[in-house]
Amino acid sequence: MNERQYAAAGVDLVSADQAKARIAVLVAGTRTDLSVGQVGAFGGMVRVPPGLRRPVLVLSTDGVGTKVLVALEAGRFDTVGEDLVNHSVNDILVHGATPVAFMDYVAGAGLTVQQIAGIVEGVARGCRQHEMALAGGETAQMPGLYQPGNFDLAGTIIGVVEEDQALHGDGIRPGDVLLGYQSTGLHTNGYTLARRIIFQQQQLQVGDRLGD
């Protein structure tokens, strides 16, 4: 099939190539001393950090849920990418793991090059903050499955921890001290309910201020 046939089916190969070129630059900017191989390969490769006696890999896959609808409403796409990374880091941190690499997945229809690049820019920024490589990912155009302009975002994180230092929760006992930290916000959870309260019940819009 040629570009014209793909375009008629709703897949823009020209824009896809432009997005890939911009993504490659962003990915290259996250490479660490553990990175192996070339940017754009079918599989992302990273070394296991040196000095570990019995390293255990800790993996987690997650998405940002309906927060993508807030991103679409606000017209800002980099923050959901960064949120995805931070959420994933938290998921493996509870097991005592240090993040090593990340893989992202963007699926949608009718997204512009700027929108796709914005999403991955946020992912790359989050990876740099945590000193881990964005080892690869996938950007899929799926007209017919997604409405034009809509998308979903997910990612997989890989971390590492010494086997005898991994946290499983099975050592928790009555009398242990529980430390709680104040959240900086909703992060990526609860947005279906939050959107209902804020946008439907309260009739607020993006840009409205709450309180003084």
Regions found by a protein language model. Give the residues of each.
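Helix-biased detector of long, well-ordered alpha-helical tracts
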Residues: 1-212
